[in-house]
Amino acid sequence: MKVSKIDVESVAEYLRLDDYEEEQIIPLITAAKAFIHSFTGLTDEEIDEHEDFYIVVMILCQDMHDNRVLYPDKNNLNRVVDTILGMHRKNLL
C-alpha cells in the first residue's frame, strides 16, 4: 500500500482501536509522514514508490500512540524504522 493511501481507519485497525476519534489519529499520520520526509529527504511521489514505507508509518503511529509522554527519549528509534528509512535516505547529513 502507498503511504498516500493510508487513512484513519487503517491506522486505527493497525493500532487495534475499537473506539477512536479522527482527531486522535490524523496528527499521528501527519507526524509520521513528516518524519519520513525529514529523515529521508524524499518527496511524496518518491515515498509512494516504496511500499515498505507503509509499515514505517504504521510503526511510527503506534509508537507515538503508545508513548504519549511529555519527555520522549529522542535517541530510541525503532530498528525496523531506522533500517527502512536508512535504505532510502537521500540527505546523508
Predicted regions mapped to residue ranges:
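Divalent metal-cofactor coordination and adjacent catalytic microenvironments
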Residues: 1-93
